[in-house]
Amino acid sequence: MKITLSSYEMELVRKKLAREPNEAEWLTIDALWSEHCSYKSSKVFLRSFPSEGEKVLMGIEDWQDAGALDVGDGWAIVLKLESHNHPSAIDPFNGAATGVGGIIRDIISKGAKPIALLDMIRVGNLSNPRNKWLLKNIIAGIGFYGNSIGVPVVGGELDFDDSYNDNPLVDVAGVGIVRKDKIVPSVVKEPGLKIVIVGLTGLDGLGGASFASRKLSGEDEIGAVQIADPFAGKIVLDVTLEIADKVEAIKDLGGGGLVVGVTEMANGLGAIVNLDKVPLRVKDLKPEEILVSETQERMLFAVKEENVNEVCKAFEYYDYPCAVIGEFVKEPYIKFLYGGKEIVSLPSDLLLSPPRFIWEIKKPKLIKSDKKPEVGLEESIRAILSRIISKEWAYSQFDYEVGTSTVLKPGEADSALISLPNGKLLALKGDANPDLCAEDSYECGKSIVAEAYRNLASVGAIGIGVVDHLQFGDPKKPEVYYSFVEAIRGIAEASKFFSTPIVGGKVSFYNENKEGKAIKPTPLIVMAGLIKDKFLRNKVVEDSYITLIGFTRDEMRGSLFGKIFGNYGEVPKARLNEDYLASQLVVNLINDEKIFFAKDINKGGLIASLFSILVKGMGVEIETSSIPSDTDDWIPKLYSENGGRFIVLTNDPEYIIRKSKGIHISVIGKITKDQGIIKIDNKEINVNKEIDNYYNYLYEVMS
């Protein structure tokens, strides 16, 4: 197992301890000081995130496994977002499957029942056979675990870009439901509690936290990938929820394994653990391997002595291993024993106080152009629409209706929608925009929060909270670090503006190949929202009016049009007040039952939003002169991706205008019965070929 600590960090350890640590202690420090566990290159900036709010029950707190939001009537939702990027690049099936399993265990560690999953996947171009292999196995792994354990995958994203050729991104978000007075902490508050482990410890996942904290080397790193067992995971899920009121704290044994789980759960107290008592899957494991193994389907409990027997009996009923391996103590030292000898004895504050780094920052030099590409209307439409594809091939492999709480199916709307036990509806949406982030990560950070807010509004929901995942290359590279810091600034600003506090998140650095080529900056957020009144299930009605809410701007840089034909102009600025006002208007129109279709304008611009109507078997006709804009140029009118805009379908546009209160509103066209025909300024274009491609592309290329 490799030690990833720098020479500076190793010397710092020696100075603080006034001695040379042994091998087991070096592995312990390496795991807890890894970027994956310590956030040593990011924590300084993450403190700018808003984490408090009216509905926040558990926010960004050290060592809590998930955030919690109040959804009324004594109920809370628990939110978590994680990735398994590095493991999925090596073993995509198990990497993705264990990513789902880890999220499930993070949710149940709060005493919550998992009710929904979202997956956000990014791989390279599918013309590359390896990328097809990655995608096929990533989807299979997610489906295998989610379907087997009985938690629906209700939505997500699927995106392709060459920057992910060697580094796929596999993000999974989970939501659970729990009575808010039954939320279980992940840390202990008093000594004397017994440390109980459930599950068998094996050789898989050795050094996984350190593996996730460096770039892929091209060497055989399969041993750092954990093996998924959803059937064991189902036992862990059910029994953990059964005994949740009998324990004082719960923690998933995830990144860094037992040594990280015990240290974080101790939360500054001490712990004494006997490794001889840890149930093993493989005989003769070395103590160092027991310490940092990341074998899946294991949990750690802090239990009062009088409840230990009841907790273990519940697991042993299913022949699932359960053992008392130690105790939390007042003395702030983490100690591990093996064979009657003390092999680790380290101060808690040393382990939980890694050095913090602020690396050099340098603004990337981007090649800018003001030269507009020369392209015709029909050529541009066909090029854009050919990039927009149905994700049905992926989500058809998931059981998205298990549990009977799914209200809107994947692909049916811009947001997932699930029912809660109190009768309310919860909306969920994940958003990222790597193309924009590659141009301006500050505006990108703001825009992904704003887009998620609009996505929720399009089904009738108002955002209440956010979890984030920040995925970048090597933080020691000044241009990468600049993008990272600026993305945080944008996300923080927008989250404060929309009153959607960030209740949890993750940072993933070193997403680059062995040549040092990094992915595009990919900050991702998942926003949760509540329906206060009515929700919208989109339908397209012939002769209804296509009404544009919002103002279109000549801001083309970072757009899908720019990606295809060449970037030019300025990046779209996130004007958060416009997003807020437009979103509130759409929610009000849904509640007033004055619209029957709503779609925010984002990737691909207005044309892409109109395409979501065309694929439903109708036609559209619009006049570009009716589009409120700062330009007469048809290209930005059709393809700009600036925010604050929706298209809605209505039979009463005058009502919308009366309710708009200063927001730009314009009837730009009508729905026709001419299937697959888009008519723009009296020019008809048949896009039935692109509609066929939309439905069939993934099925054909992945066959």
UniProtKB/Swiss-Prot annotation:
Q: Where in the cell is it found?
A: Cytoplasm
So what family is this one in? Belongs to the FGAMS family.
Positions of Mg(2+) 1 binding:
82
Q: Where are the transmembrane segments?
A: none
The protein's gene is named: purL
Example GO CC term: the record gives: cytoplasm
Q: Under which EC number(s) is this enzyme classified?
A: 6.3.5.3
Into which EC class is this enzyme placed? ligase
Q: How does it assemble?
A: Monomer. Part of the FGAM synthase complex composed of 1 PurL, 1 PurQ and 2 PurS subunits.
- Can you name this protein? Phosphoribosylformylglycinamidine synthase subunit PurL
Q: Which UniProt keywords apply?
A: ATP-binding, Cytoplasm, Ligase, Magnesium, Metal-binding, Nucleotide-binding, Purine biosynthesis
Q: In which pathway does it act?
A: Purine metabolism; IMP biosynthesis via de novo pathway; 5-amino-1-(5-phospho-D-ribosyl)imidazole from N(2)-formyl-N(1)-(5-phospho-D-ribosyl)glycinamide: step 1/2
What processes in GO biological process is this protein linked to? 'de novo' IMP biosynthetic process
Q: What does this protein do?
A: Part of the phosphoribosylformylglycinamidine synthase complex involved in the purines biosynthetic pathway. Catalyzes the ATP-dependent conversion of formylglycinamide ribonucleotide (FGAR) and glutamine to yield formylglycinamidine ribonucleotide (FGAM) and glutamate. The FGAM synthase complex is composed of three subunits. PurQ produces an ammonia molecule by converting glutamine to glutamate. PurL transfers the ammonia molecule to FGAR to form FGAM in an ATP-dependent manner.
User: Which residues are the active-site ones?
Assistant: 36, 84 (proton acceptor)
- Which reaction is this enzyme known to catalyze? N(2)-formyl-N(1)-(5-phospho-beta-D-ribosyl)glycinamide + L-glutamine + ATP + H2O = 2-formamido-N(1)-(5-O-phospho-beta-D-ribosyl)acetamidine + L-glutamate + ADP + phosphate + H(+)
- Major site of localization recorded for this protein: cytoplasm
Question: What GO molecular functions are on record for this protein?
Answer: ATP binding; magnesium ion binding; phosphoribosylformylglycinamidine synthase activity
> From what superkingdom does this record's organism come?
Archaea
Does Nucleotide-binding show up as a keyword for this record? yes
Annotated binding of substrate, by residue: 83-86, 105, 226, 294-296, 508
Query: Where, in this chain's numbering, is Mg(2+) 2 bound?
Result: 106, 252
Tell me which residues bind ATP: 39, 80, 468, 505
